[in-house]
Amino acid sequence: LPDRKRLEVARALATRPKLLLLDEVMAGLRPTETDEMVAVFKSLNQETGITILLIEHVMRAVMSLSHHVTVLHHGEKISEGTPEHISQDPAVLDCYLGEEEDV
């Protein structure tokens, strides 16, 4: 992982919080670095029981780390549920993949 990201995470964990708020922590990372970061947070959650609140656009990371997901579009909640539910919700698919057009 890039050193700056490691430092940011270490600084946040120094006080041994019960809740870790991560805001776009995957931004600017390559896919392999994102995978490393996901593994770090999964391990951290399992070993310490820390709650992680993730604000993120990298959906692969969101789906991998989350037990519960809330999806916002222009500040409005459009869906909420498990990653499995979110990945199949027509409202989410329409917002992020575009609506099907009649051909």
Provide a role label for each language-model segment.
Residues 1-103:
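Glycine-rich phosphate-binding loops of nucleotide-dependent enzymes
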